[in-house]
From Swiss-Prot:
Protein's UniProt name: NADPH-dependent 7-cyano-7-deazaguanine reductase
Catalytic activity annotation: 7-aminomethyl-7-carbaguanine + 2 NADP(+) = 7-cyano-7-deazaguanine + 2 NADPH + 3 H(+)
Role noted for this protein: Catalyzes the NADPH-dependent reduction of 7-cyano-7-deazaguanine (preQ0) to 7-aminomethyl-7-deazaguanine (preQ1).
EC top class, as a word: oxidoreductase
Taxonomic source organism: Bacillus cytotoxicus (strain DSM 22905 / CIP 110041 / 391-98 / NVH 391-98)
Active-site residues, record numbering mapped to chain: C56 (thioimide intermediate), D63 (proton donor)
Pfam families registered for this protein in UniProt: QueF
Binding positions (substrate): V78, E79, S80, H97, E98
Gene: queF
Keyword Cytoplasm attributed: yes
UniProt EC number: 1.7.1.13
Superkingdom assignment: Bacteria
Gene Ontology terms: biological process: queuosine biosynthetic process; tRNA modification
A single GO molecular function term of this UniProt record: preQ1 synthase activity
Annotated compartments: Cytoplasm
């Protein structure tokens, strides 16, 4: 199989762009996609994002997290540099941890219409408590909906050792 052609990547404008602008306000419109060349099979794509930051909506203090995004694509896939810039746009966004994870998941669902997706944020402790919100989605009426239910029921069954991340 040959590699991707330039015409296959016409919607990918940020990758390789040396004039990238970093946005400091929540910006879902920065997300870009490219075609999934393997729509006939299920496979996971996982992003490990260890430098996520946002702001507490009440105090304005910074929150830090590692975010894990896993999805099974259908026709479209998110381009990683656009995802990086999108996550960076949360830097001055004030929202609770749980809201940030759900917003990210909802934006990616709207962008790609994946078969399945999960987003898990592992936030560093503040005030002696770490918060690890997890959300997922499986396309309704499909095996992926059942998969989402199963993964939710079995999520995080075993306590972990928290070592201040």
């Amino acid at each position: 199989m040959a590699g991707r052609l330039d015409e296959d990547l016409k919607d990918v404008t940020l990758l390789g762009n040396q004039n990238t602008k970093y946005l400091f306000e929540y910006s879902p419109e920065i997300l870009e996609t490219f075609d999934n060349n393997h729509p006939n099979r299920d496979y996971f794509v996982k992003f490990n994002c260890p430098e996520f930051t946002s702001l507490c909506p009440k105090t304005g203090q910074p929150d830090f997290a590692t975010i894990y995004i896993s999805y099974i694509p259908e026709k479209k896939m998110v381009e990683s540099k656009s995802l990086k810039l999108y996550l960076f746009s949360f830097r001055n966004h004030g929202d609770f941890h749980e809201d940030c994870m759900n917003v990210i998941m909802n934006d990616l669902i709207e962008l790609m219409d994946p078969r399945y997706i999960e987003v898990w944020g592992k936030f560093t402790p503040r005030g002696g408590i770490s918060i690890d919100p997890y959300c997922n989605y499986g396309r309704p009426g499909t095996k992926y909906e059942k998969m989402a239910e199963y993964r939710m029921m079995n999520h995080d069954l075993y306590p972990e050792t928290v070592d201040n991340r």
